[in-house]
């Protein structure tokens, strides 16, 4: 009975982890830990077949299907893969293959990208449907969202089968992920946890326009269907490339397991050179006839196996949980650790994200914790070694008061973060807002850095960004590391900031969710701070690309008396709080409805001036050519890839002079 109890317990635990991973997109353990538990259950079920259960996690591919989209049954089931973690396990797999098939076996090695699996159906060269993996038997129809991903061809090239499915992975490159998080932090939002969950969550967004704004990519790796004219896995990859799919160039054909192991070892060392997150290598029998002979188990194909890289994870002691306050008042718990080497860096601190995460992991001070570093900005704690826990330890009580000003924290319905409401009295919020105000993309005050701002606040010389404009040289001279010349530079830099245009001043105010792009849009629409302050949520929502959240935040900001007072003071000090008459005279809607891409070096005007001209005259700017691009403004030494793509898509290619004539 003890064995039956153990089996039942493992099944329940794995089913819960499946639910967390596939339904909630909130895994509580690493893939490696999950696979170890699954393997333990498989071995027990094989040893004690009397406890067999058709609903065991060992017989299923994954979790339940999300119900937000239409559920679609896969014509060809999407199996999961068996996992391996050692050379010996790969050699055992090969031995099993050779017992079933005769003749030489070739292998295709493919990097295992960590994203969201997708199945695309094409008929007569046209994308008809895109379905998530779901539970392997059925998934969610996310066609509209997938169509926004530019690496997914809507119409194929060359000669292709009448109908087929092609499987792939939706991934978020590190660079794009970092950019998304930088924008979120800039707007006072919590950064996304990692590329995989962000990619997966993107597919389930209701608004396809939001998906289009995310730099997702689709990497394809497997053709399936009848009468495809493809005889092997590697041939399928080559044909898919010809048809217009993005197929990773790192995939290689190998003649032996020894060559496969060389491939695995190479990429285990070089995976951080790739633009995407990878967690292993998939090894497949190349020949489709041999694949057919080998067949499938109830859970996975016998002809393929995944070799999982060991997670870059270490255990260390959590000494103390402290709390940081951001410029918007958001509270972030931080784990202070014994120093540990991880992914080439020394880690002493790790994110705990929020109160829910602490409760979910049951993290306590004094615990030995597992720290992991993947695509995250900073390392994170993924688990606790409960075998090493002090029996007298107490559960973590999340902070109830601000660590800086002792104000009672608040937590709004539906939000993960706690906030300090003491907007105008909490030092980190004051310092953070002023540091944002002086930053390069905002007021760009020369001679004034983040450390100096902290010194000024701590010396009670300033309490808001408006206070900067009343500073005198004599007041700042006594500050640490402040000499006569640097004090002069600081005061002069503050004075010059009075020339910064309205849209940058609006961004500098630090309104939550109002980044550079939104600030430009609001400035252009309202033309003055008075008009913006008088706007209602309804009026704001009617502006293109301004949603309810931004509208609420803008109105809320100007409802606060201290913010209105700061704006009045800025006006008195001569800050640009409206679009200048000269700029208004230069603005038109001549280019409205047109999207431009700029490439190369120009003679008469700089690239920045060109961009400004486009925006001032109602046009839109893009960094890359797409079917929505109307004009490519071509200068000397322009990128050949942009030129080729523009020619291919039939985009109008114009010179600097052609563009300037459009404004006449």
Curated annotation (Swiss-Prot):
Coiled coil location: none
Any single Gene Ontology cellular-component annotation: cytosol
Top-rank EC class of the record's enzyme: ligase
A biological-process GO annotation: DNA replication
Cofactor(s) the protein requires to work: Mg(2+); Mn(2+)
Entry binding sites for NAD(+): 31-35, 80-81, 110, 133, 169, 284, 308
One Pfam family here: DNA_ligase_OB
EC id: 6.5.1.2
Chemical reaction(s) catalysed: NAD(+) + (deoxyribonucleotide)n-3'-hydroxyl + 5'-phospho-(deoxyribonucleotide)m = (deoxyribonucleotide)n+m + AMP + beta-nicotinamide D-nucleotide
Classification via SUPFAM superfamilies: BRCT domain, DNA ligase/mRNA capping enzyme, catalytic domain, Nucleic acid-binding proteins, RuvA domain 2-like
Residue ranges of the TM segments: none
SMART domains named in the record: BRCT, HhH1, LIGANc
Keywords: DNA damage, DNA repair, DNA replication, Ligase, Magnesium, Manganese, Metal-binding, NAD, Repeat, Zinc
CDD domains given in the database record: BRCT_DNA_ligase_like, LIGANc
Function per UniProt: DNA ligase that catalyzes the formation of phosphodiester linkages between 5'-phosphoryl and 3'-hydroxyl groups in double-stranded DNA using NAD as a coenzyme and as the energy source for the reaction. It is essential for DNA replication and repair of damaged DNA.
Family: Belongs to the NAD-dependent DNA ligase family. LigA subfamily.
PANTHER family, per the entry: CHROMOSOME TRANSMISSION FIDELITY FACTOR 18, DNA LIGASE
Protein's recorded name: DNA ligase
């Amino acid at each position: 009975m003890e064995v039956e109890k153990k089996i039942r317990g493992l099944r329940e635990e794995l089913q819960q982890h499946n639910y967390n991973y596939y339904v909630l997109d909130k895994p509580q353990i690493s893939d490696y830990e999950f696979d170890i538990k699954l393997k333990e259950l498989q071995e027990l079920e094989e040893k004690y077949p009397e406890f067999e259960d058709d609903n065991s996690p060992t017989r299923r591919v994954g979790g339940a299907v999300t119900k937000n989209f239409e559920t679609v049954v896969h014509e060809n089931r999407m199996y999961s893969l068996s996992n391996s973690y050692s050379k010996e396990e790969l050699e055992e797999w090969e031995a099993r293959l050779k017992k079933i098939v005769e003749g030489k076996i070739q292998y295709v090695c493919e990097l295992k990208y960590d994203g969201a699996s997708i199945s695309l159906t094409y008929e007569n060269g046209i994308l008809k449907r895109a379905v998530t993996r779901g539970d392997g038997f059925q998934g969610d129809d996310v066609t509209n969202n997938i169509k926004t991903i530019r690496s997914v061809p809507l119409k194929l090239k060359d000669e292709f089968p009448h109908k087929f499915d092609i499987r792939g992975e939706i991934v978020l490159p590190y660079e794009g992920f970092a950019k998304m998080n930088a924008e979120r932090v800039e707007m006072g939002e919590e950064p996304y946890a990692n590329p995989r969950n962000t990619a997966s969550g993107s597919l389930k967004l209701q608004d396809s326009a939001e998906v289009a704004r995310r730099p997702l990519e689709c990497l394809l790796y497997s053709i399936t269907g009848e009468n495809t004219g493809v005889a092997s896995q590697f041939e399928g990859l080559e044909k898919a490339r010809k048809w217009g799919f993005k197929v990773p160039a790192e995939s290689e054909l190998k003649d032996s397991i020894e060559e496969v192991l060389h491939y695995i070892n190479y990429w285990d060392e070089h995976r951080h050179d790739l633009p995407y997150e990878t967690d292993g290598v998939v090894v497949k029998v190349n020949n489709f006839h041999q694949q057919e002979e080998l067949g499938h188990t109830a859970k996975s194909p016998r002809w393929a196996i995944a070799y999982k890289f060991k997670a870059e994870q270490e255990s260390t002691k959590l000494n103390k949980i402290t709390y940081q306050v951001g410029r918007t008042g958001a509270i972030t718990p931080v784990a202070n650790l014994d120093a540990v080497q991880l992914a080439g860096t020394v880690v002493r601190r790790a994110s705990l994200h929020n109160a829910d995460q602490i409760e979910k992991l049951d993290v306590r001070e004094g615990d030995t914790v597992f720290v992991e570093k993947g695509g995250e900005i900073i390392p994170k704690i993924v688990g606790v070694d409960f075998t090493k826990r002090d029996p007298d330890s107490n559960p973590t009580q999340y902070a109830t008061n601000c660590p800086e000003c002792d104000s009672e924290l608040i937590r709004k319905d539906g939000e993960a973060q706690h906030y300090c409401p003491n907007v105008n009295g909490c030092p980190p919020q004051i310092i953070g807002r002023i540091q944002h105000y002086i930053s390069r993309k905002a007021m760009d005050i020369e001679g004034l850095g983040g450390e100096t701002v902290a010194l000024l606040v701590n010396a009670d010389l300033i309490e808001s960004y408006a206070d900067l404009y009343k500073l005198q040289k004599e007041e700042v001279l006594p500050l640490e590391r402040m000499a006569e010349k640097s004090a002069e530079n600081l005061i002069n830099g503050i004075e010059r900031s009075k020339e910064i245009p309205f849209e940058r001043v609006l961004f500098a105010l630090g309104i939550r969710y109002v980044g550079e792009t939104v600030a430009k849009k609001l400035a252009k629409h309202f033309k003055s701070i008075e008009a913006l302050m008088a706007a209602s949520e309804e009026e704001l929502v009617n502006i293109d690309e301004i949603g309810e959240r931004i509208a609420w935040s803008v109105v809320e900001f100007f409802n606060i008396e201290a913010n209105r007072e700061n704006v009045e003071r800025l006006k008195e000090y001569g800050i640009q709080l409206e679009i200048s008459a000269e700029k208004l005279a230069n603005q038109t809607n001549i280019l409205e409805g047109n999207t431009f891409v700029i490439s190369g070096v120009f003679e008469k005007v700089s690239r920045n001036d060109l961009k400004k001209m486009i925006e001032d005259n109602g046009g839109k700017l893009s960094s890359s050519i797409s079917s929505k691009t109307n004009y490519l403004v071509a200068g000397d030494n322009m990128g050949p890839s942009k030129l080729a793509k523009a020619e291919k898509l039939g985009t109008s290619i114009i010179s600097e002079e052609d563009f300037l004539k459009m404004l006449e």
